[in-house]
Structure formats: structure tokens, C-alpha cells
């Protein structure tokens, strides 16, 4: 049994006093009773749905609140954190010690004299490189969320649990002094890397706790040479590991969910001396327009112990997954074992030998697959490119480019080149190859078919792409295969999909110019400058 007196003393050391009761690492059964009990109001209230899962609302915060994210500027962080600047705007805004202390006082005062849920878990399935994290909240469903998302310790591990990091969730409290303190609003998500504490105030969005801890892993791991990556990962029957990077809408979840391979995880991973490991003990999947036919694994995972966020629940308790009236960002969290085809008992495997960067190029320029050199790997990893089609008033669809460093700029705490250095070092040690896979459009005006994309992924995973004769795509200087089994050869060189190759040329020059302009911000250090030659020639 865990010594609750010890837990209470540790809460007092944080500034949380006179706690009425500590509900420590509650079971799923307990959490179900707590979050559906009569008398709960507002955003604390859970609604039982016909799926068996409980649904909750998070109010106006239906996504993360990056404008309210701050990190304390101190001796430890001043020269390590990738601070926001005029040339490279990001979400790492500095906060002084006095403001931090006032926010900490607000949250600890809110949590004092209450009945609290304390959940201890691990972030990271590597015994050597995990963070022991403690989450303190007065809201039952928030305890449920973190029980789903973090790795659940054994009884034995809980006996002597010493938290490395504490998340204090005070979503009911806001900051009245935000204007004088020069903050963005009364809501806050603040980190102190020296005290190893995250404070949450004002926002009820569950993802702040999950993404907060992945931002912390993104700080601590690369500083000791361990990769920290926003990617999905799976492993084949022979133990061969593949990792998939990609922004939203590129097919990261779909392509890594493969009946022939076991899933390691769908979102956040580390790469240490043993291999690839999941940061999480659960999945946080989007549910808008979810159907059993299109995504059977996720659909079946929504059952008892899963937690739905911001979905529309009909009067009979059924869920309308097509209704995005509260938000398009409807979500479900569930423990990873709700998915059948996963790595057991621990979400980790050996070193990755295939690294896949997914992009959905709406400009119709990039090839469906290209093999990257180590320098190109760093360049395209730092660029983190994808593009969406957005309609304009006149009905013309204009591509909108997105460049997100390391395919996850919002969660990077260090300079992006540090993640690229660690990734390529790990790849070289493992003899891994990198590929850029375009799941977007080509000169036909149509999206590359899922059948062809799956054929490309299969050719990468089974090694047949290594035997293919290669050509080179000009401007981007990318190596492209001339033929692959099960893939339409007519699409492999994007120039061949245009009736007039000059059209590809002008689009390619335009896109190359965008890459070059975006990369200027990385040329502020020597590593970044050295990579310019690996990019396209505008």
C-alpha cells in the first residue's frame, strides 16, 4: 500500500494544505462512479453514453491554448530553451520568477482544503529515460484522462513512487493580475523546469496535461542524447521498427495502423540506446466523422474506461460523431490496450531502421516517395512541410503551406537543430534510411490513392525500394524510384502527371522558394547554415 501520509506531506511541500481527502491512483471503477455521480455540475460532469464511455465537455477550451503557455526564465533555461523571437516566433514565452510564484499561489490555494485526486504515472516506457509524473486535480475526469494517457505503474512501483515532475491542474482558477504581469489572458499553462512543476489555470482542455509532459520530455531527453519525437511507430514480425512523422491530415495514424505490424504508439516516442519507446500509456484520437468502417480500431476502442471530449451526445445517450458544433477537435482518450494489435507488455521495441516523413503536398510538386541523404533528412525534418487546400471566394482552391519544425514545432522546447542532430545520430548508429512520402496531390489534380501510398509504404518496409533503379528530380535534387511493386509507375515522377512539364517546373520553383524562405530562421547557427545546400534550389 502507498503511504497516504507521505503523499499529504509531499502536497504540503508544494503549498497544498488541509486536504480533506486524497483519492490516490483510483481504479477505473472508482473513477466511473466519481465522474458520473449525481450533483456534479458544469465541466466536472460526465455523461454516460451508449458506447459505455463517459463524455465530458471542456467549455470554450476545445484545444490547447498556446498563447497562454509560458516557461520560467532562470539560470537553467536561459541558454537551453528555444525562446520565441522576432525571427522565429514560437510558443516558448519567458515568465519571471515573481509571476510564477503568484500563479503557483493561486493554484495551490485553489487545491487546498479540497478532496483531491492524485494520480502517479510514468511518461516514457524506458525505465532509464522515463519521467515519474504526479498529477494533482480536484476533478475526477481529469484524473481519468491522465490514467488513460500516462503509463500505469504496478502496485510495487507505487510503493516507493518519487515524482520527478508534478502537474497541478487548477482549471477552476483564473489569474486576475494577468494584465499587470504582461500575460496573454487570465488563463495560463506555465512550466518551471528547475522546480519541475506544470501549473494549469482557467483551461479545462485535457490535452494540456498530455502535451505539457511531452514538451518536458522534449526538453530533458535530447540534452542527454536521447531522441524525442512527435511520431507514430510500429514493428514487424521480424522486429523491424518503422517510425512515421507527419502533421495532422498526412496519414500518420492511418498508415502506422497496419494489420501486419504491431503498434508501439501513435503520437509521442523516444529513441534511446535500447530502441524506440512510447511516451504514453494511451491514445488520444480525433473522433470527428469517425465510423466503424473507416477506422475500426479507434471505433472499437470507445468503450467502458474510454473518455470522450466535446462530442455531441443525443438524448438517448448515443454519440453523433459527425456533429462538430462544439468543435471539429472532438477527441477520445483510452488506454492503449483497447487496441488489439499492440506491442506487449511494454510499448517499446528495437532501433528504427525505416524513418518516414509524411507530407500532403497540395501544390502537386513533390514525388510520392523519395529516398533522403543524411543532410536531406535533417533539412526536411527541420522544414516539417505539409500543405492544405483552402477554398477561396471565387471557388479556386489555393494551397496553404505549413512548415512546422520537426513535424511538431508547438511542442519543441529546445532549438529544432538539436532534435535533428539526435535523430540523424541515432539513425546512423542503427543504419536507418529516411524517406519523404507525399500523400497529397499531383498533376492530375487528384490526391495520390491510398492504394498507391500503402504500396509505397510496403516497398519501404520490405526493402524492395532499395533494389529499385533511381532517378533524380531537379530543383529538389531528390532520389526517386523508377518502378515499385504494386504502385502505378506513371505517378513516381511528378513531372509525368502533368500534360505540360513546364507547369510542374513553375510550381516547383514557387514551392522551392517557400522552402528557402522558411529555412532562413535555422541559418542562425552553424548546423543550420550547413544544411542549406541539402534543400531545394530556388
UniProtKB/Swiss-Prot annotation:
GO MF annotations, alphabetized: ATP binding; metal ion binding; phosphoenolpyruvate carboxykinase (ATP) activity
Gene name of the encoded protein: pckA
EC number annotated for this UniProt entry: 4.1.1.49
Protein name per UniProt: Phosphoenolpyruvate carboxykinase (ATP)
Database matches in HAMAP family: PEPCK_ATP
Organism whose genome encodes this protein: Haemophilus influenzae (strain ATCC 51907 / DSM 11121 / KW20 / Rd)
Subunit structure: Monomer.
Superkingdom of the organism of origin: Bacteria
A GO CC term attached to the entry: cytosol
Keyword ATP-binding: yes
UniProt subcellular location: Cytoplasm
Function (record text): Involved in the gluconeogenesis. Catalyzes the conversion of oxaloacetate (OAA) to phosphoenolpyruvate (PEP) through direct phosphoryl transfer between the nucleoside triphosphate and OAA.
GO biological process, one term: gluconeogenesis
Cofactor note: Binds 1 Mn(2+) ion per subunit.
A Pfam family this chain is assigned to: PEPCK_ATP
Record's keyword terms, sorted: ATP-binding, Cytoplasm, Decarboxylase, Gluconeogenesis, Lyase, Manganese, Metal-binding, Nucleotide-binding
Chemical reaction(s) catalysed: oxaloacetate + ATP = phosphoenolpyruvate + ADP + CO2
Presence of keyword Metal-binding: yes
Binding site residues for ATP: 211, 230, 246-254, 295, 331, 447-448, 453
